[in-house]
Amino acid sequence: MSETSKIIAVTSGKGGTGKSTVCSGLGYTLAKQGHRTLIIELDFGLRCLDIMFGLQDKIEHDLSDVLSGKMNALDACAKVPMASNLEILCAPKTLTPVTAEQIYSICRSVKKYYDYIIIDTGAGINSHVFDIVEQANLILVVSTPDQVCIRDASLMSDEFYNRGNKSQRLIINKVSKKVIGNSLVKNLDEIIDKIGVQLIGVIPEDFKLTVATAKGDPIPTESEALLAFDALSKRLNGDFVPLTIKGA
């Protein structure tokens, strides 16, 4: 892919990790920092980004219109009012066949218009996801601090490495306030060791963010999770931001 845009694939070993929330938070903060950002949603039949950004009644077109040749990708994208530099290309409401080449053909067609293209992959360990992330510049593996997610994230990461995808980073999501503090550091280290991927961000569990995204309200500026996404966005852009637990 061209150097004019950076393609980031956000994926997880299982559903329920908050992968789409990570995509929305990351896309929002990148856009707020002045980066032209597009999120392409691939959870076919299970789309949710429209709700997260309060656009559930305003999406006129989605990825199926592009795949069918009805319209080009730029025209199918929806602008997000709460962040002027952010656009989303929503997944179809129904299951629709798609190949990795089709997705990257779309990326190639719009790459000069964006600084970052975030691909919200479907969850799960399968060849389709592995093919989709093949040409991404960076893979963000999302896990929560529970044993099932950790094991699945480890299996997924190992398969990425086996396929030659070396550029991976780990995001630990939904970290409860109850365990934020010195006692968590050892547990975080254990998670990193088990998954085998360098940590780039810890996102605290945040009730305000959960409620806002569920209702399609603007992301609350006082949200601790938003501070963590802001720090994560800066790291992805090459800035040095110390990785702390609170506001990670």
List where the protein language model places each region.
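Conserved C-terminal guanine-recognition region of P-loop GTPase G domains, centered on the G4
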Residues: 151-165
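Inter-motif core of Ras-like GTPase G domains
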Residues: 126-147
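Glycine-rich phosphate-binding loop used to anchor ATP phosphates in small-molecule kinases
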Residues: 89, 110-128
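Walker A/P-loop phosphate-binding motif and the immediately C-terminal alpha-helix
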Residues: 3-44, 110
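Structural beta-sheet core signal
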Residues: 39, 119, 141, 169-172
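C-terminal lobe/tail of nucleotide-utilizing enzymes
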Residues: 162-248
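Conserved nucleotide-binding/hydrolysis micro-motifs of P-loop NTPases
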Residues: 44-46, 94-95, 124, 146-148, ...
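P-loop/Walker-type NTP enzyme "switch/lid" segment
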Residues: 39-112, 211-218
